[in-house]
Amino acid sequence: MERLRIIRESRGSYVIQVYGEDHTLGTLLVEAIKRVSNPKLAYYEAVHPMEDIIQVYVKYEDDVDIKEVLRKASDYLLEVIGDFRRRYLEALERRGGGG
């Protein structure tokens, strides 16, 4: 089963369907897309409450390389999560390893 499907609706307008995910990734992905590119509009919605499918809608002034935008957004999220992990582990170490 595919995990991701990109649909170009019209010039500069894309729908990214993500299977097996929910609001957690939807919120993170939209915010990351906004950070790494300059969309006119970016939001997501759950397809149905009983299905783990989200659709991310992104609109730009003109066509973009949406795969490159998603790569940059993924890199950004990995960087943020890595930074959080590093800070968390440093804090644990300062407290003597307890959590």
UniProtKB/Swiss-Prot annotation:
Top EC class for this record: transferase
Report the EC number(s), separated by commas if there are several: 2.7.7.6
- Protein name per UniProt: DNA-directed RNA polymerase subunit Rpo11
Has the keyword S-adenosyl-L-methionine been applied to this entry?
Answer: no
Which keywords does this Swiss-Prot/TrEMBL entry list?
Cytoplasm, DNA-directed RNA polymerase, Nucleotidyltransferase, Transcription, Transferase
Subcellular localization, per the record? Answer: Cytoplasm
Q: Which organism is it from?
A: Aeropyrum pernix (strain ATCC 700893 / DSM 11879 / JCM 9820 / NBRC 100138 / K1)
Give the UniProt entry's GO cellular component terms: cytoplasm; DNA-directed RNA polymerase complex
